[in-house]
């Protein structure tokens, strides 16, 4: 049974990796990425909400009847 000649395999593998690297470089070179988003400046007006100044009960148990 003849032996398999593996002396050229490192050359083939290295040339394949080089070709894949070059193809990926060319592919990423031709892609156009969106520019980074800049924050939109808005005029924020302070709201005068009555619940900001006093404590309110934010929980209620719906299974219990209301207690006064």
Swiss-Prot record:
Compartments it resides in: Mitochondrion membrane
Keywords: Acetylation, ATP synthesis, CF(0), Hydrogen ion transport, Ion transport, Membrane, Mitochondrion, Transmembrane, Transmembrane helix, Transport
GO terms for biological process, alphabetical: proton motive force-driven ATP synthesis
Residues annotated with N6-acetyllysine modification: 54, 57
Taxonomy, superkingdom: Eukaryota
GO CC terms, sorted: mitochondrial membrane; proton-transporting ATP synthase complex
Residues annotated with N6-succinyllysine modification: 54
Matching PANTHER family: ATP SYNTHASE PROTEIN 8 (PTHR13722:SF0)
Family named by the database record: Belongs to the ATPase protein 8 family.
Annotated protein name in UniProt: ATP synthase protein 8
Organism field: Hylobates lar (Lar gibbon)
Encoding gene per record: MT-ATP8
């Amino acid at each position: 049974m003849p032996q398999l000649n593996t002396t050229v395999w490192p050359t083939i593998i290295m040339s394949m990796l080089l070709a894949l690297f070059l193809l990926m470089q060319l592919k990423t070179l031709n892609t156009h990425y969106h520019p980074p988003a800049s924050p939109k400046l808005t005029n924020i007006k302070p709201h005068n909400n009555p619940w900001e100044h006093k404590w309110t009960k934010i929980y209620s148990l719906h299974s219990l009847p209301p207690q006064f």
